[in-house]
Amino acid sequence: MELKVKIEELRKSKLFVATPMYGGVCNGSYTRSLCDLSVLCSRYGIEMRSYFLFNESLITRARNYCVDEFLRSDFTHLLFIDSDIGFNPNDVLALMALQTDESDYDIISGAYPKKCITWEKIKSAVNKGFADENPNTLEQFVGDFVFNPVRGSTIKINEPAEVSETGTGFMMIRRKTFEQFAEKFPETLYVPDHVRSENFDGSRKINMFFQAEIEKESGRYLSEDYWFCFKVRSVGMKVWLCPWMHLQHSGYYTFAGNLPAMAALGVSATCDPEEIAKTKKKK
């Protein structure tokens, strides 16, 4: 999507990046992307704050604490970025440009794949010749994405698409969305456990914006991000996805090669410089 961004308008917004980070561990691609985002915001004069929550094992509680920290600040936009997500910092500015107070982008996110390899999609790409020129392109067909479209809708790749659910791994939420949520669902106020912090000492209530729950009508078990989207949509707000954004979702993978299988295929079991050179020439 071609989006004209007015930097002077973006400077009116303040970006609060929140990352729940159990064990204080993050991925290298996330670290590099966050550093690039910090540099980009500094270059354009956009105020940005990074907030990390370490050692909270319950993700629902961690996200609620992050939101409370945001709401007690004067920042305008909260961006959840999970510690295993790599991203293009320009996409963050695009989300901010789209999510103005006048727009109906109450929640807007980028699309990222789940940590799985969908071999049938890779096979389909190979059969259709998508990897004939460069086999490295097969990585584009890996994984199922973390969102569910609105039933009966058609998604256009080059513009924001309304969805029923999307993940918090790369999700922007403006302040007004949380305020409307709190107003519509006053029963979500609760007393947080004491966590040895001056802001969470059990003396005041905060809102439960995130919770995992079984949805009554469908019987589905909703994760905390899908539950949040469900509740937001139930009171007339909207959830959007930017299909053109490219995100990386890092995880562990077990490599299980098989020498007899490679022999049957007729390929080298070790690194073959000649085959690699052929691939590079085709790029």
Predicted regions and their residues:
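Conserved catalytic core of nucleotide-sugar-dependent glycosyltransferases
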Residues: 67, 88-212
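Short beta-strand-to-loop acidic/aromatic patch adjacent to the donor-nucleotide binding site
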Residues: 75-86
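N-proximal low-complexity "stem/linker" segments adjacent to membrane-targeting elements
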Residues: 1-57, 61, 281-283
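Active-site nucleotide-sugar/metal-binding loop of Leloir-type enzymes
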Residues: 64-77
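Hydrophobic pocket-lining residues that define ligand/cofactor binding sites across diverse proteins
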Residues: 70, 99, 232
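Glycine-rich phosphate-binding loop at the start of an alpha helix
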Residues: 60, 64, 226
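C-terminal catalytic/acceptor-binding lobe
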Residues: 2-16, 183-283
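Short, Asp-centered acidic motifs that coordinate Mg2+ and/or phosphate
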Residues: 77, 106-107, 239
